[in-house]
Amino acid sequence: MKTNIIPTDGMVITEDTTFAPGTYALPNGITIGADGVTVAGEGVLIVSPQQVGVGVAAQGRRGVTVRGLSLNGFYHGLRFDDCEGVTVQNVNVRGTQEIEGIDTFLYLWLPIEKTYGGAILLNNVRGGTLLNCDLQHQMNGVLLYNTSGVTMEKCNASFNSGWGVYLSNANENTIQDNQLDFCNRVYRRPEDGSIRVEADAAAIVLVKGSSRNRFLRNSCLCGGDGVFVAGYEHPGVVTPCNDNLFEENDCRLSPNNAIESTFSRGNIFRRNDCSRSNYGFWMGFSWDNVLEENIVEFNRWVGIAVEHGHNFTIRNNRIRLNGEGVRLWTRSAVGEGVMPYWPGYEVAYDFTLENNLFETNHTGFMGYTGEKITDRECRAFHLRGNTFRDNRVGASFSRVQDSTLSDNQFVSNVEAAVRLVGKPGVTVGANTFEANAADVAEI
């Protein structure tokens, strides 16, 4: 091992190396040029003045480790391509390339050749660990392209103007125990000049079929979205992000959606806090999803919103103090927007809601077919074993068929426990009604 080495601009490292503490201007960075190499640098800061190039790069290497370095001012702080078994530990990255601000809406589907700047980029990497890294105050924290088997743990990628963690065609990775707070972006809408926090910034983003990943115990507070899963690029590019697990993440305080997961199948959302946002969950055009044991409170519009979705299980959630607790509905007309690319998704159907608490919402449950769909209706909404307490309306149905209410408790709902608009096809079975203004109101 080489120790106390003064790094030089563009140097290639082929054996274990520890740099001497200090600040070094290396606009061409350094390259790891052999397998099994460790580069260490406690007290070392490597800088570039122009936000171009890469601070530490490796291509086609195995078993490389970077530990303890600080980097500032590159396009990417660290970049690994076509590698296996990469470890990045206790690294600090700041000041990587960032696009212009208020008038730029982010594009979620950039190819690797045009990727945004960021602290760490892994492309076509198999296996690795990102541990205890500080990746705050730039555009993006970690970018994973075509990468699998990587664990990102105990990193801080907060206060970024794009994404904390971004996955594009990235599968079977684990993202756990990270701080990914305040990843948001101010955007001026060109049509009217209004300014909002949006532009598809988020703590966690999945695109291009990123599947079978695990997201555990991450803090995603105050993101543009907390989590954004986007399985479709308009027009006609269908790449669902399937079979991911989101468990015990804190996604509160988004001005948009605590969790948005669209056009994707088989995702599980368990014990997340999706509160104090415009929407807790936005789940359009998704299917075969499970939402269980989540906290969904104080959302401005809707706690759980699913348009044009099907085959959901929504169980054991605490759904309180929202505008609407759960909304299942249709919005688009046949032939409009994305509908030509999603045949069979004209209505919402096959939902099971069981053992949830709906409390102090304006409307606990809302199921309806929108006015733009005229030749068919939503169907098979089955609500059983739920408690509806102190809502203005417990459960409301309009233009819905083959649906059931059974074994639910309706207590102290202010206007009605159940509201049926226009004689929908809803069977009200054996439920418990207590102290409601009306038990079943037909309008």
Where are these regions (language model features)?
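Acidic/polar low-complexity surface segments
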Residues: 47-57, 77, 89-123, 128-132, ...
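Extracellular "leader-to-stem" segments immediately downstream of a signal peptide or signal-anchor
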Residues: 1-31, 67, 89, 94-112, ...
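Extracellular beta-strand-rich solenoid/capping regions of secreted or surface-exposed proteins
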Residues: 6-14, 25-38, 47-67, 71-87, ...
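Generic detector of contiguous secondary-structure segments
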Residues: 21-34, 68-94, 154-183, 200-223, ...
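Ankyrin-repeat and related helical/solenoid repeat scaffolds used for protein-protein interactions
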Residues: 359-360, 366-430
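Detector for repetitive beta-architecture
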Residues: 10, 16, 23, 29, ...
